[in-house]
From Swiss-Prot:
Has 3 domains, the large (RuvB-L) and small ATPase (RuvB-S) domains and the C-terminal head (RuvB-H) domain. The head domain binds DNA, while the ATPase domains jointly bind ATP, ADP or are empty depending on the state of the subunit in the translocation cycle. During a single DNA translocation step the structure of each domain remains the same, but their relative positions change. This is Holliday junction branch migration complex subunit RuvB. SMART domains: AAA (SM00382). The RuvA-RuvB-RuvC complex processes Holliday junction (HJ) DNA during genetic recombination and DNA repair, while the RuvA-RuvB complex plays an important role in the rescue of blocked DNA replication forks via replication fork reversal (RFR). RuvA specifically binds to HJ cruciform DNA, conferring on it an open structure. The RuvB hexamer acts as an ATP-dependent pump, pulling dsDNA into and through the RuvAB complex. RuvB forms 2 homohexamers on either side of HJ DNA bound by 1 or 2 RuvA tetramers; 4 subunits per hexamer contact DNA at a time.
Amino acid sequence: MEDRMVSASYKNEDFDVEHSLRPEKLSEYIGQDKVKEKLSIFTKAAKMRNEALDHVLLYGPPGLGKTTLANIIAREMGGTLKVTSGPAIERPGDMAAILTSLNDYDVLFIDEIHRLNRTVEEIMYPAMEDNVLDIVIGKGAAAKSIRLDLPKFTLIGATTRVGLLTSPLRDRFGVLSAMEFYNEDELKEIILRSSKILGVVTTEEAAFEIARRSRGTPRIANRLLKRVRDYCDVKGDGVIDINIAKNALSLLEIDGEGFDKIDNKILEAIIDNFKGGPVGLETLAYFIGEELDTIQDVYEPYLLQKGFIVRMPRGRKATEKAYRHLKREFKEQTKLT
């Protein structure tokens, strides 16, 4: 999975390009209009009252701009962004150290917040509700509890699996926002903006071609733009036009739907090996040699959103659209029931 060009999961190579292309204001942020409107109103209201923004939960597939929004919020609130992840915070003491290092209006961004362990999560409750940290010093009969005041901070949690959050944690977020896949026009705008920052000329037609193969995900769009730029530097004349874009994307083996070999392997398995489905995700993951979480978090959301598979009580089933994509005959008995 790490080598997939169209994986929305974060890669090391994404750091420099994302940092350089990242918008610094909500007004510069393309797409996610409903999320932006809410955050714009709530940040302005918080600043008018000299309060920290209420805690924010951003959920949805990876690569849609959660970290970018956290950066913008920290900048808008006049604080510093501190970034960590659920798996990285192993003990309550780790979380206590992070919380006590914050200053007023700082933003603590926790990626994969659904993976916080329960003991760590529990010390977050008073921190989120009352800006206090309860810690226990000593053991046994000599143990005593100390309450520390915390600065006015904002916790931004990000997750691809909102259903795995416990109710007590989820209920302590004042702002819950679903991040949605981007449409092709939004991605085209992102690609044209990124092209200017990178100093490369990209035609609108070429930008749209890259956009429609970017799986609705800005991270993938910017990654593909970098690879098309490489191709253009070697094979072109300095301008990314439609032919350069198509040839580069063909070389990367990304088809017109934004699918690579793995996506097509999933569809082929459902149709050719399981008669169109339904087939359980565990069985499917085993058959194609991927982890169950990878299927659920990385591949399935886009296939569902594009209408190539559907969820059924007994598993996943390929749609007529998937049959057409693979040039398979869609027989009457394979229709969805």
